[in-house]
Design a protein with these regions (language model features):
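Short acidic/His/Gly/Ser-rich catalytic and metal-binding motifs that mark active-site loops
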Residues: 91-95, 140-146, 216, 224-226
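Conserved aromatic-histidine-acidic binding/catalytic patches
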Residues: 20, 103, 107, 154, ...
């Protein structure tokens, strides 16, 4: 294609998959309208009132950003930012009607709006930060329950919009031009939709200790939140090894199992934990954020 000065037309463009189809000029406008209507019909019918997105009212300073479910703490001297996402504080609605009544305060909507806001703050206001440490806090069971409700009610237009928003925000995380390190310590809740943060990271460190953290999968890890390439983060991680990407929903992994399954990069024990994480942060922070 690059060597043809005259370009590619018609049937050859279709056969080379450069375009979907060719249409005569006499039918062009009609065919475009038909395709547009067909695509529009794939969206769930919207019934009932919409949802007003209330302001997030985050607190911004030179030291970071503080939201209800997401916080960003800046260590300017070390050129490291700690991004922490928290699980729901209580039980989340289980039906589409109840979710719509909760509106913009629904955890899956508000928390990911806050994550989007923090990622944009990093992009535009923190150019010297080279490393972002991804952390989570809270009860993993509440995250999994929220995921399960979203999945079971996904046919509802509002729930579908929430899932689409989560997908877009996670794509922004994928495309964030900083080194991303997930730190999976005690008290973490990398489960379901929040497990995607660890899967999006360039490196992940999980503490291997008695009573240590665990990872857990939900239905949302299996295709509801794809990357920009159309694949899941698991599918991208195991490109060329599709059988390894077929991890069932509802599985729980300790550090050893997560390392064997390829879900984390490193699993230091308590003796090496502090030093390994510190050295990793110092190594990455020593490199230019622009180069990364």
């Amino acid at each position: 294609f690059s060597s043809l000065g005259e370009g590619v037309k018609g049937k050859r463009a279709v056969s080379w998959r450069l375009v979907d189809e060719t249409v005569p000029l006499s039918r062009f406008a009609t065919r475009v309208a038909e395709r547009a209507k067909a695509l529009a019909s794939l969206s769930p019918e919207k019934t009932g009132p919409g949802v007003v997105l209330a302001p997030l009212d985050g607190r911004y300073s030179d030291d970071g950003v503080e939201h209800r479910h997401v916080s960003l703490k800046i260590d300017a001297e070390a050129r490291v930012a700690h991004l922490t996402m928290r699980a729901p504080e209580g039980a989340e609605p289980q039906t589409a009607t109840a979710m719509r009544q909760r509106g913009s305060e629904l955890w899956a909507l508000r928390a990911f709006r806050e994550l989007d806001d923090v990622l944009l703050d990093l992009r535009f206001n923190r150019p010297e930060i080279g490393v972002v440490v991804l952390e989570t806090q809270g009860d993993a069971a509440r995250v999994l329950a929220a995921d399960a409700a979203l999945w079971s009610e996904r046919a509802d237009w509002f729930v579908n919009e929430v899932l689409q928003h989560m997908k877009r925000v996670l794509k922004r995380l994928d495309l964030t031009a900083r080194s991303l390190l997930a730190v999976i310590d005690r008290g973490s809740c990398f489960a379901g939709s929040l497990l995607e943060l660890a899967l999006a990271a360039d490196r992940s460190y999980m503490l291997d200790a008695e009573g240590g953290p665990t990872l857990a999968t939900s239905q949302l890890n299996l295709g509801a939140l794809p990357m920009s390439n159309g694949l899941t983060r698991l599918g991208t991680r195991f490109l060329g090894e599709p059988e390894r990407a077929r991890i069932p929903a509802g599985e729980t992994y300790d550090a050893a199992a997560a390392l064997t399954a390829g879900l984390v990069t490193f699993a230091p024990d308590e003796i090496d934990w502090d030093d390994e994480v510190r050295l990793a942060l110092e190594e990455r922070a020593s490199l230019s954020p622009d180069a990364l």
